[in-house]
Design a protein with these regions (language model features):
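C-terminal accessory/tail domains of diverse enzymes
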Residues: 2-115, 129-346
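Short, well-ordered loop/turn elements at secondary-structure boundaries
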Residues: 119, 217, 350-352
Length: 432
């Protein structure tokens, strides 16, 4: 198959099929099944069996399931909880437009008393059919390189990290990148370390944040690293993240395994989310939920840049405060009863010069000391320039430099008489 043919078969991010498993307690399996049935307008059917299964058909005839999960520690808001309160909701194979239904089911379950405690998790399965040996190596490297940031962003419980969603296995990672398998059988040999155990449901290799045992057992890539939640927006964010990672693995020629380190986690992770395609208004809440637990500044890569921006904003506020105070003093000193009193515009046009001052280096007090006749007559913006701070700390100074599309807030001072010469000697404050 040529590269072009391979690319033509890759589904878009929103075209991938997926499923979700949500572990909960706080209500019984029967109550959860009834809530889903009420939302779908259908009647749950008790199937029974080892997992005490309830099946609930949706509007398209697909089956939602509510089953027992013995890893859940039960609790309820009132009374005594028993094993009936071990609830796992399993979706059918879903499409991207099904996400709002999944969110509403989560909301209805929360209203019905559902609790997501520390023993509960969420597993998301993405269809593995479009993937091959190369893309599975890509997704392994993507997860290995970003897993430290992902664990922190998702606030994965320490117990879950060490038991049910361990990091990518280093031996598997090394072998995948050293051998570069060409087909799925070769990937299977590396994953299991020998003979395939795909028929075993509870194989020990499944308990990783990226579970490829699921690829060989049921044809899905499983992401196991999410704490369970009854927050519908977070559930949507988790689905978006899994679909985006899977899609990135499909379209990239290769991916680096190198660990991502950063002095500004929030900026680094946000940049990665944008590269994954989680950009624009549609994914605004997704980015919000995935970034809220990370440290750093979202807007600036270098923390020093953020500090300089704060200084620029502080300078602008000081200019505005000085201008307002000067204007207030001018109004208080004006004889408003005299109809011949000059208006502000007329005063600006009388003999003298108008000067522009940027930043806060030349405050009202300093200007008055240099030029006793100085006063603020307005605020403006200097177009196609930017305000920069040169030097470090106590030696820093402000300057403006040309930059297309930018603007610098400035104060307009009025200077008269001999004071013009004093200000002309002060470098950086040109008159208009």
């Amino acid at each position: 198959m040529t590269k072009q043919q391979e690319n033509e078969q890759v589904p878009g991010m929103r075209e991938q099929r997926f499923g979700i498993e949500i572990e909960l307690t706080g209500l019984t399996r029967r109550a959860a099944a009834d809530i889903i049935g009420d939302y779908m307008g259908t009647t749950p059917v008790y199937i029974g069996g080892f997992y005490y299964v309830y099946e609930i058909p949706d509007r398209e005839g697909r089956q939602w399931r509510v089953v027992l999960d013995n890893s859940i520690k039960v609790e309820c808001k009132s009374g005594i909880a028993n094993d009936e309160y071990k609830v796992e909701v399993v979706s059918p194979i879903c499409r991207y437009p099904d996400i709002p239904d999944i969110q509403e089911i989560v909301r209805q379950l929360r209203h019905g008393g559902a609790i997501a405690n520390k023993s509960c998790g969420i597993h998301i399965h993405v269809n593995a059919t479009p993937h091959n040996a190369r893309t599975l190596r890509n997704i392994t490297n993507i997860m290995a390189s970003k897993e430290d940031l992902i664990y922190k962003a998702l606030q994965v419980e320490v117990a879950r990290k060490h038991q049910y969603c361990r990091p990518v296995d280093e031996t598997f990672l090394d072998e995948m990148n050293r051998k570069k398998p060409r087909n799925m059988d070769e990937v299977s040999l590396i994953w299991y370390g020998g003979r395939s155990r795909r028929s075993k449901h509870y194989d020990k290799t499944r308990y990783h944040c990226l579970n490829l045992h699921s690829v060989f057992q049921k044809g899905t890539i499983e992401f196991r690293l999410f704490n369970s939640t009854t927050h519908a927006g977070k559930v949507k964010a988790y689905i978006h993240l899994c679909l985006a990672i899977s899609y990135q693995a499909l379209i990239q020629k290769c991916a680096s395994r190198r660990k991502t380190t950063s002095t500004n986690e929030k900026y680094t992770f946000r940049t990665w989310l944008l590269r994954l395609g989680l950009i624009g208004e549609e994914f605004a809440n997704t980015r919000k939920h995935l970034l809220e637990h990370l440290d750093g500044c979202i807007a600036w890569k270098d923390p020093a840049q953020a500090e300089r921006q704060k200084e620029r904003l502080r300078a602008r506020r000081e200019m505005e405060e000085n201008a307002n105070q000067e204007g207030k003093e001018n109004l208080e000193g004006r004889d408003v009863s005299n109809p011949m009193t000059k208006t502000g515009m007329e005063e600006k046009m009388e003999e003298g010069k108008l000067y522009v001052a940027y930043g806060s280096n030349l405050s009202l007090t300093q200007m008055r000391r240099r030029c006793p006749t100085a006063r603020v007559v307005g605020l403006a913006e200097l177009m196609d320039y930017e305000l920069l701070f040169r030097g470090r700390r106590e030696n820093a100074f402000a300057t403006i430099e040309p930059k297309q599309g930018s603007c610098v807030p400035v104060m307009i001072w009025k200077i008269q008489g001999d004071d013009e010469l004093a200000l002309d000697r002060y470098e950086g404050y040109p008159h208009l």
